């Protein structure tokens, strides 16, 4: 069954599911700024809207639009800004799993 996640007073919501051999979420973010932490390697694909990402140990913001993807390593914090409602898919990988998505991450 699906697990519903809600963060930042309901401004970020996701549904957790199994995507092949890995855990995944499909989610939405309302306009705003957020900070997330990872416990496993995460590959995020933007499916609607735009996300601006500030990676760990980086001073610059990187812009990602529809169908763009990016990777965040395990045990890191990263910042997200979205200028409007956005949607994403996030896949979670442990050390034994490789990224098998087709997004050139």
Model-inferred region functions:
Residues 18, 54-56, 81, 93:
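A generic structural motif
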Residues 1-19:
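Transition segment at domain starts
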Residues 73-100:
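Ligand-binding loop in jelly-roll beta-barrel domains
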Residues 38-53:
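Short, conserved beta-strand element in jelly-roll/cupin
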Residues 10-11, 19-39, 66-74:
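Conserved short histidine dyad/triad with adjacent acidic residue
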């Amino acid at each position: 069954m699906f697990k519903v996640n809600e963060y930042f007073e309901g401004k970020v919501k996701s549904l957790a599911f199994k995507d092949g051999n890995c855990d995944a979420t499909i989610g939405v973010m309302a306009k705003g700024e957020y900070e997330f932490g990872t416990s496993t390697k995460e590959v995020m694909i933007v499916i609607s809207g735009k996300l601006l990402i500030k990676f760990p140990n980086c001073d610059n913001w990187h812009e990602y639009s529809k169908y763009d993807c990016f990777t965040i390593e395990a045990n890191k914090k990263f910042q997200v800004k979205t200028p409007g409602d956005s949607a994403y898919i996030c896949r979670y990988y442990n050390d034994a799993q490789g990224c098998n998505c087709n997004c050139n991450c």
